[in-house]
């Protein structure tokens, strides 16, 4: 990881704290993973404060595969089966079947419809009947131990929400360049500067949790 690019966002702990503060106020954060892993950066928002404008940004600036990160208990409550019985993904990404809100959407693909689907899935009264499949939102099941168990964006998202005191549900999408290639740290930092966001890394979050015994 190119640390000098990250220094403008503070120390390891400061970057995490800034990210948590941003999430608490309904803003997004950018999270980069290890250079020897996916070497990608994700735009992340809290599911409970997500707006259609923020969803539109994710659709416009990112890969378009908008994912809803959920802890295991929420996946079970919604009755969502995993996308495949035998996961052969190189990173072990835990996709469930895709979802759509059962009510309040049209085709399900617009920013507003996708937000409606997210809100339906995280509602306190949510149940399997609140959703339809397939759909245009892709849930991801986080490992119970968070980033201390798996250093993925899914776990980082759920960990950040919990540390921020929010519901443990977040939405992510991989940031891409205008030509469709994946954004790396330099492009991630540039995007953050242009959009007044902060950048942190999965490694920062691991260190933060370990140092604080969380």
UniProtKB/Swiss-Prot annotation:
The lineage of its organism: Bacteria, Pseudomonadati, Thermodesulfobacteriota, Desulfovibrionia, Desulfovibrionales. Its EC number is 4.1.99.12. NCBIfam families: ribB. The keyword Magnesium applies. Its cofactor is Mg(2+); Mn(2+). Belongs to the DHBP synthase family. Catalyzes the conversion of D-ribulose 5-phosphate to formate and 3,4-dihydroxy-2-butanone 4-phosphate. The gene is ribB. This is 3,4-dihydroxy-2-butanone 4-phosphate synthase. GO terms for molecular function: 3,4-dihydroxy-2-butanone-4-phosphate synthase activity; magnesium ion binding; manganese ion binding. Mg(2+) 2 binds at residues 38, 153. D-ribulose 5-phosphate binds at residues 37-38, 42, 150-154, 174.
């Amino acid at each position: 990881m190119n640390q000098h690019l990250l220094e403008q966002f503070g120390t390891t702990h400061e970057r995490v704290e800034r990210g948590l503060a941003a999430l608490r106020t309904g803003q997004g954060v950018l999270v980069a993973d290890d250079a020897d892993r996916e070497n990608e950066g994700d735009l992340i928002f809290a599911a409970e404060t997500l707006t259609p404008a923020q969803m539109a940004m994710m659709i416009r600036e990112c890969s378009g595969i908008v994912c809803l990160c959920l802890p295991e208990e929420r996946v079970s409550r919604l009755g969502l089966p995993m996308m495949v019985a035998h996961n052969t993904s190189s990173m072990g990404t835990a996709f469930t079947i895709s979802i759509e809100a059962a009510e309040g959407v049209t085709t399900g693909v617009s920013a507003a419809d996708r937000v409606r689907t997210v809100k339906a899935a995280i509602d306190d009264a949510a149940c399997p009947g609140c959703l339809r499949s397939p759909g245009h939102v892709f849930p991801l099941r986080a490992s119970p131990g968070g980033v201390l168990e798996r250093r993925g964006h899914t776990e980082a998202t759920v960990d950040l929400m919990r540390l921020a005191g929010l519901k443990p549900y977040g939405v992510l999408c991989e940031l891409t360049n205008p030509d469709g290639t994946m954004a790396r740290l330099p492009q991630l930092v540039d995007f953050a500067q242009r959009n007044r966001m902060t950048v942190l890394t999965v490694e920062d979050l691991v260190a933060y949790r370990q140092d604080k015994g969380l």
